[in-house]
Amino acid sequence: MAGRRAVARIGPGALLVLRALLAAAHPQCLDFRPPFRPPQPLSFCAQYSAFGCCTAEQDAALARRFRVLETRMDAGVWATCAGYALDLLCQECSPYAAHLYDAEDPATPLRTVPGLCEDYCLDMWQTCRGLFRLLSPDRELWALESNRAKLCRYLSLDDTDYCFPSLLVNENLNSNLGRVVADAKGCLQLCLEEVANGLRNPVAMVHAGDGSHRFFVAEQVGLVWTYLPDRSRLEKPFLNVSQAVLTSPWEGDERGFLGLAFHPRFPHPSKLYVYYSVGVGFREWIRISEFRVSEGDENTVDHGSERIILEIEEPASNHNGGQLLFGDDGFLYIFTGDGGMAGDPFGKFGNAQNKSALLGKVLRIDVDRKERGLHYGIPPDNPFVDDPGARPEVYALGVRNMWRCSFDRGDPMSGTGRGRLFCGDVGQNKYEEVDLVERGRNYGWRAREGFECYDRKLCANTSLDDVLPIFAYPHKLGKSVTGGYVYRGCEYPNLNGLYIFGDFMSGRLMSLRENPETGQWKYSEVCMGRGQTCAFPGLINNYYPYIISFAEDEAGELYFMSTGVPSATAAHGVIYKVIDPSRRAPPGKCKIRPAQVKVRSHLIPFVPKEKFIRTPESTPRPTARAPTKAPRRRRPTAAPPAPTPRPTKPARPTRRPGARKGGGRRRGRPSTAVPEPENGSVRLVRPAGLSPGRGRVEVFIGGRWGTVCDDAWDTKAAAVVCRQLGFAHAVRAAKRAEFGEGRALRILLDDVRCAGSERNLLECAHAGVGTHNCKHDEDAGVECSHQDPNL
């Protein structure tokens, strides 16, 4: 790794310089959070009115302490010592208060007097040594009061860069203070907070916009989970269409449950819309459906309310699109892929350039009315409603496979940017791109990929009239863009207006910021905070490399979802919240008051699993820079290399769950190791032709799969297995090898007795792993269901 090699060459003396440089990026308050800009000027510690760690209330409290000190000192002495008292009291407001008071480590006692530089301490001792006793209850400090050298040693800091008052003139600490920290190469250093884990390819996270501040997380297999503002998860799924969803465990299968969106006036009506893959015989389709929330439980969908709005046949198993969004206009925007395979080979110009095809498009429909024999209405201002050769649903064309789009909420103060539609469009051989989608525009595919021609004849067609992306990057940086969001949240003002996105294959986080004067977009990579930047409670500096999707919560804060194993059945997905360690909003400004929601399901509390890594490796970046604007020649004449043929089977498509295996966290390059199943994982093995949810139970323990004996096997044990597999109900516990004997495996569990609430069979009472008095003709099985068998 480039950064690692650099450190290896630096000697002990130079390493101190490096530490000082790293310290420049680490302002922190005594509450272990970033400093802020007070909403109103401070009257006592006025030097920290622009940026620091005190509110007006805290400033007033320090002023009261100052006045108390004045009453406890002789007037003549106070005239000499008041300046020292002001200096020391106000260091609680310093943007580096955590360093001044040795609060970097929450486990160590907090100083009562800030760390002082030697010269300052010696001068203060000479004239105002009695002030130390009044400032601090520390009796050890009191005992040193008469010994100048020992006292000043006691009040010194190990890191002298932070001692007062030298830190006030330290250029490394004060240049760009309060701005997003960037390294020498311009890589923005941010931190993360783990929000949820144990998810199977989390493809989407959305909120309902109803004031509840719940968020709903969709897994590729077809389950949607409800999370409350305290990050606990409801045990019962919000939605379960896993029996209808077409997907597989293959790493690289792009099919599955791909997107959802709540009606813009939710909960009146209490509708939501979903986007998923289905199979009918040997044909595959994408389906857009409407559901209603259950009248008896606002955290559960009425599964019988499904109304299919639109189905589009997919000629191949990849490039399925998957995004659903409602705009400010109240219309539903649907983002479809070009139908799959390489080079959009369907018809003379491909699906994406064919206005009469719904594939390779951005569609826009009205879900609140029906017309023309359709299950939806056509907005009257759709661009091609009067074109007899076009589908009226088409809003924009020339799309290859837009994976993750978002509407800009607009600047919180001015509203600038509101309604802009950003999309990441996955490329073919050379480029990934970010587009600003507008009504009636053509985004170039398959004529163009990024800024370059892909199909020479189409590219030279004067009627193409395509729009270039706002940004495109070569495959040196990544091979599968994941579109993100423009940050418009409250908590981190420095991020306002920053478009943050990523790449699924390289695990790279990236950002764009628009220059309002030129309209150009500036690219910056996003890195995890180095050194101690993120070393505070609740923050981490690493993530799993396969970036699947981005999200924003109801308050506008930014998240992303990634996994170490890109399979729809691997529970390795994690949701991370993006944190700016350089500056936060003033305390209390972003407080939310969630609307109350009745909870009828058991709650599963959130338990973080990810850890802060103390020596993160820097991320090597290619020397070739990604283009941030179009080349001067609008129409390149040279054709790109012929497209690489792609397999028609969905085992290794160009989009989500990637072609490479691996589960390493993103610090340097992703690891190539594939994690094995967790201890206690289960699977069902069933004879051919048997429906899903029924089969012989096999359990993974100690690195191997094995069977379970049916002694004491009952529906409580079956319920544990079914819940692990994503089913809400256990219909029955099967015995006597009803679903076949697992003779090739060892018998791993016997005499299993469960209460029914355990997370896996290992938590149930049992005879001991590998201990049994049975044969395979007693192999246990289960029958699971998404529906209550008693209804």
Curated annotation (Swiss-Prot):
Pfam families: Folate_rec, GSDH, SRCR. Residues 610-689 are annotated as: Disordered. InterPro entries: 6-blade_b-propeller_TolB-like, Folate_rcpt-like, Glc/Sorbosone_DH, Quinoprot_gluc/sorb_DH_b-prop, SRCR, SRCR-like_dom_sf. Keywords: Disulfide bond, Glycoprotein, Secreted, Signal. Residues 638-650 have a biased composition (Pro residues). Residues 682-785 form the SRCR domain. Residues 652-669 have a biased composition (Basic residues). SUPFAM superfamilies: Soluble quinoprotein glucose dehydrogenase, SRCR-like. Residues 1-27 form the signal peptide. It comes from the Eukaryota. It is found in: Secreted. Belongs to the HHIP family. This is HHIP-like protein 1.
